[in-house]
Curated annotation (Swiss-Prot):
Catalyzes the attachment of tyrosine to tRNA(Tyr) in a two-step reaction: tyrosine is first activated by ATP to form Tyr-AMP and then transferred to the acceptor end of tRNA(Tyr). Residues 342-402 form the S4 RNA-binding domain. GO terms for molecular function: ATP binding; RNA binding; tyrosine-tRNA ligase activity. Keywords: Aminoacyl-tRNA synthetase, ATP-binding, Cytoplasm, Ligase, Nucleotide-binding, Protein biosynthesis, RNA-binding. This is Tyrosine--tRNA ligase. The gene is tyrS. Signal peptide: none annotated. A motif ('KMSKS' region) lies at residues 229-233.
């Protein structure tokens, strides 16, 4: 007798937080086979650390894992040395073997903060590509045309703008697609920016005599600026290995407009519980309360319960990055009095972190002022309602909430 939930119930759980399933009919058919499906998601180790944007996809892997399916966390050590052209306006420089191996090791440590290591297969696509010959690669390349590759949005833009496209970049979607053949994947997961690559795998499987995989895309998580996708290079990220206090404060610093989005994509709470919290906020509950609830959940997930309980605290008179000292004052500042935009020197003064305006300006000019642990210069300003942790020097700190 099968231990799987009915296919329709599984589908409903899988649909949560997804952008698109290609196709739901095919997925339902596979689920009705009452067998562990082979679920694949690939990650190119192009940077040493994962952030919460990556975990949206990993959370979906966990959902499949909890339903009893076979999850493969594929580390694209081979494809990382090609460089994924997705969303790029120029050719990405390839990484060295040493960089890839170091990053891959860190990825494994971080992903098991979410996935069960005893139920997760970790594979490297160099396992099969290092065995391929030039003839194999040419045969793979023959499966697609240049015109099909140019249907990809980023390639089209570069072609129309007379920007170079290297031949090896055309190979990337084919190589990623072949990963699905090597793993005989039933389902592949990816971000919405990976749709072209996922569909390539679906197409290639059919041409290589396999049943085509289902492609599931998940949304791209916006960063703390509320505009751009979460990215370490943009400084708008929350790292999986951030210290508890830093993670807690970063969640509190997100714009109110992201609260629903972050709960939907990052929280493991039930949809009913999340909706209840959102209803309370709509009826007047302080948005900061919801941010604290989510912050505590995330700190506990990536650290532990004790870290979550003490995330808002710190020790000693000297401030340690990532630790918010106990008793940190909370200050509210109205932007309306400043025409909607207020610069950092004024913020430091109004928060009581210096005795006067001259000291505030001096602290900023010396690089002694940090916002959410990041040093800022005199051009930093606040134009929206958010909460920041403002630090001036080694001892002065305040949690500042901005209102209209």
């Amino acid at each position: 007798m099968s231990n799987f939930l009915p296919a329709e119930e599984q589908l409903a759980l899988i649909q949560r937080g997804t952008h698109e399933i290609i196709s739901e009919e095919d997925l339902l058919k596979k689920l009705k086979e009452n067998r562990p499906l082979r679920i694949k998601a690939g990650f190119d180790p192009t940077a040493p650390d994962l952030h919460l944007g990556h975990t949206v996809l990993i959370n979906k892997l966990k959902a499949f894992q909890d339903l009893g399916h076979e999850v493969t966390f594929l580390i694209g050590d081979y494809t990382a040395m090609i460089g994924d052209p997705t969303g790029k306006s120029a050719t990405r420089p390839p990484l060295t073997r040493e960089q890839v191996e170091a990053n891959a090791k860190t990825y494994q440590e971080q992903v098991f903060k979410i996935l069960d290591p005893n139920k997760t297969k970790v594979r490297f696509n160099s396992e099969w590509f290092n065995q391929r010959t030039a003839a194999d690669l040419i045969q793979l390349a023959s499966q697609q045309t240049v015109s099909r590759m140019l249907e990809r949005d980023d390639f089209t833009k570069r072609y129309n703008n007379h920007q170079p496209i290297a031949i090896h970049e055309f190979l990337y979607p084919l190589v990623q697609g072949y990963d699905s053949i090597a793993l005989e994947a039933d389902v592949e997961l990816g971000g919405t920016d990976q749709t072209f690559n996922l569909l390539m795998g679906r197409t290639l499987q059919g041409r290589y005599g396999q049943e085509s995989q289902v492609c599931i895309t998940v949304p791209i998580l916006e960063g703390l600026d509320g505009v751009n996708k979460m990215s370490k290079s943009l400084g708008n990220y929350i790292g999986v290995f951030d210290a508890p206090g830093a993670m807690y404060q970063k969640v509190l610093s997100m714009p109110d407009t992201l609260i629903e989005r972050y709960f939907e994509l990052l929280s493991f709470k039930s949809l009913d519980e999340i909706q209840g919290l959102l209803d309370e906020m709509a009826n007047g509950r302080n948005p900061q309360d919801l941010k604290k609830i989510l912050a505590l959940e995330l700190v506990e997930r990536f650290h532990d319960a004790d870290a979550a309980a003490n995330a808002h605290k710190g020790a000693g008179n000297i401030i340690t990055e990532g630790e918010i000292p106990e008793g940190t004052p909370e200050v509210t500042i109205s932007r309306g009095e400043f025409g909607g935009e207020i610069f950092i020197a004024s913020i430091v003064r109004l928060a009581g972190l210096t005795k006067n305006a001259a000291q505030a300006k001096d602290a900023v000019s010396r690089g002694a002022v940090k916002v959410d642990w990041q040093v800022v210069d005199a051009n930093f300003s606040v134009k929206e309602n958010k909460t920041y942790l403002i630090q001036a020097g080694k001892k002065a700190i305040a949690q500042v909430t901005f209102t209209d």
